[in-house]
Amino acid sequence: MTPIRHNHSDGDAVLDAVRDCVLAVGVRRTTMTDVARRAGVSRMTLYRRWPDVRSLVGDLMTREWVAAATGAMPERRPGTLTRDLIADGLVAGVAAFRAHPLFHKIVDVDPELLLPYVLDRRGASQEALLGLLADVLREGHADGSVRQGHVERQARALLLIVQSFALSLRTMTDADDTELNGDAFLAELRGILERTLTP
């Protein structure tokens, strides 16, 4: 798994501060001065580790998205197929991501921040998630519950599927129709993943 660049308590305090700033005013209106003040550190301390607000927000998104994904993975119980663990974890991860307040704020106020990670390149959180997926896919190959295939390609295909649900689901749902609400689409996602993974 790709490590988060600033994974220690001082960095966490700074990332907590940038999260609070972004939730309050959005990314564009967040300044290094605001973050330093909230974190109780000098601006120079911030600039030694992060060149600008965008790099801070990038590390924040990595921390938050990876935590949401790993926190959504169900506990492995005896007799549980790895395929079910993957499908259930990915569906829960999409639900957690969609409910995340930082995701809502970025989509509502600064959606252009997500475009590079959808159209141009993978970010650190995507790389970390691909690593997690590759590991669990290998387990599924070994126990026979997941269709054999090129692990990295399978991981990337799964991430493409769940990203589309996480980022675009609200454009397809109809809250007043139980057949087209968010829960119905998450059930559909579960079926897609099951069919994709089954040998």
Go through the PLM ranges and name each one.
Residues 98-120, 167-171:
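Amphipathic alpha-helical segments used for helix-helix packing
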Residues 49-50, 61, 133:
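Tryptophan-centric aromatic hotspots in well-structured domains and transmembrane helices
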Residues 1-25, 29-38, 54-58, 63-70, ...:
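Basic, helix-initiating cap at the start of DNA-binding domains
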Residues 17-21, 96, 161:
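Short amphipathic alpha-helical elements of helix-turn-helix/winged-helix folds
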Residues 1-3, 92-95, 127-143, 160-161, ...:
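C-terminal peripheral helix-coil segments that are non-catalytic and often amphipathic
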Residues 69, 105-107, 116-143, 152-159:
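Amphipathic alpha-helical packing segments from all-alpha helical-bundle domains
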Residues 40-50:
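Short hydrophobic/aromatic patch on the recognition helix
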